[in-house]
Design a protein with these regions (language model features):
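Flexible "arm" and connector segments at domain edges
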Residues: 2-137
């Protein structure tokens, strides 16, 4: 059994951010699901409230042009989103990889990005939609 202290040198090389949040949740007695499902209403609402709170902090930080607070809010959004993933039993590492692969499939047949007039990345001929359903069973 490996016991992790509050900080381990090189920890970021050992665990993904999603796994670090799992460690936090287990340490603090929060439920970490291994199978995808909804939690009880109280937990579902907590997860939604945490994400909403951090999004509001991001809006305020951007309005006041405070990069330190933007960094804090963005990091907290990631943290509470990963926590929600664990609360719902959804492996966000695997989901992220699937979405990343899908996003990279948007390249044109020449291997270059395709943009619309506003600068939005468009879907290329080899685009495939991410299949997140395989991570929900």
């Amino acid at each position: 059994m490996i016991i992790l202290s509050h900080h381990i040198e090189g920890e970021s090389l050992l665990m993904t951010n999603f796994e670090k949040v799992k460690h936090f949740m287990q340490t603090f007695g929060q439920e970490v699901k291994t199978k995808a499902s909804f939690s009880d209403e109280k937990t579902n609402q907590l997860r939604l409230d945490l994400i909403s709170e951090e999004l509001e902090e991001l809006k305020n930080a951007m309005a006041s042009k405070d990069l330190l607070e933007v960094a804090d809010a963005l990091t907290d959004i990631l943290y509470v989103t990963y926590g929600a993933g664990h609360a719902f039993g959804i492996n966000l590492d695997k989901c992220f990889d699937e979405v990343q692969n899908s996003n990279m499939s948007k390249l044109g047949s020449d291997g270059k990005p395709i943009y619309d007039e506003s600068g939005k990345v468009m879907k290329g001929p080899d685009y495939f939609k991410p299949d997140l359903s395989k991570y929900l069973s």
